[in-house]
Design a protein with these regions (language model features):
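Cytosolic juxtamembrane N-terminal segment immediately preceding the first transmembrane helix
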Residues: 7-31, 238
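Central cavity-lining transmembrane alpha-helices of secondary-active solute carriers
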Residues: 65-80
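C-terminal ends and interior cores of transmembrane alpha-helices
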Residues: 96-111
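C-terminal membrane-cytosol helix-exit motif in multi-pass small-molecule transporters
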Residues: 170, 174-181, 203-229
Length: 272
């Protein structure tokens, strides 16, 4: 902002700085869309596997459990890894892990092995956790702090938009050719057809994730400064527990996500 000769305040924009921030935001926006797509795909995959593999409701719920339990034991290791390799490499590694998971769905479908599907869900959950651990703080730090909330809100909208797109894509690519009633006893040929319909879409998903990971790796995304360690892990844990608002906030988010997942991802079972 500068004053003109007539005393009028004039605002100027640092165009190069704005341009430098646009491309990183576009790339990060794509990553948030991928996160939402991978997460909300569970709601379509679970009832499909239930019918294809003739699972009980409890067994079908393991499809969700194996995905979300990955957060429990990979979140802290993801933070440790990002401190070592940086945010940008952390995002690329997260995409690589998700690509590996996409490839695991192929032998799972070909052999119709429930355990392999659960392993693929576990791996994609781990990759999603690594990617999210890297990209969330990146959104905050990539631009001015006073507009961080705006950026986070936009990314959240993209994430939820993927939740609308994911079941539509799943239906168009996988379910559209299958017309047997949900309560019908499937023949071996029908089960084979359902399994085969998963191969090409997940192969395409793996290829897309791999290409996007390479794009992130070699993109002009600026690397953020690594945070310095302050004290031991025990000291850091004590510092966190000393803040009741933070502790209760984490617990609230835990319960909220549980309710959201139950409502959003299990409703497909009642539609069968």
């Amino acid at each position: 902002i500068k004053a003109t000769g007539e005393g009028i305040m004039e605002m100027t924009v640092d165009t190069p700085k704005v341009r430098r921030s646009i491309l990183p935001m576009v790339i990060v926006a794509m990553l948030f869309f991928v996160l939402g797509f991978a997460t909300w795909l569970n709601g379509s995959l679970m009832p499909y596997l239930k019918q294809m593999l003739q699972l009980t409701p409890l067994q079908a719920s393991l499809v969700l459990f194996s995905f979300y339990i990955a957060v429990t034991f990979t979140a802290l290791p993801s933070a440790w890894l990002i401190r070592r390799v940086g945010y940008k490499n952390g995002m690329a590694l997260g995409m690589a892990v998700m690509m590996l998971a996409g490839l695991l769905y192929i032998p799972a479908a070909q052999t119709q092995t429930f355990g392999l599907f659960l392993l693929a869900q576990l791996v994609i959950g781990a990759g999603q956790t690594l990617l999210q651990t890297a990209v969330n703080p990146y959104v905050v730090k990539i631009g001015p702090e006073d507009t961080a909330a705006v950026r986070i809100s936009i990314m959240g909208i993209l994430n939820k938009t993927a939740g609308v797109v994911a079941p539509l894509v799943f239906t168009a690519l996988i379910v559209s050719g299958f017309t047997a009633p949900a309560d019908a006893t499937l023949t071996a040929d029908q089960i084979d057809a359902m399994a085969a319909s998963l191969v090409l879409p997940y192969l395409g998903l793996a290829a897309f994730l791999g290409l996007l990971g390479l794009a992130v790796k070699y993109s002009p995304l600026p690397e953020l400064e690594k945070e310095s360690d302050t004290g031991t892990g025990t000291d850091q844990l004590k510092a966190v527990l000393a803040k009741p608002a933070l502790v209760f906030g984490v617990l609230s988010l835990f319960v909220y996500v549980a309710v959201e997942v139950i409502a959003g991802d299990t409703i497909g079972l009642f539609a069968l």
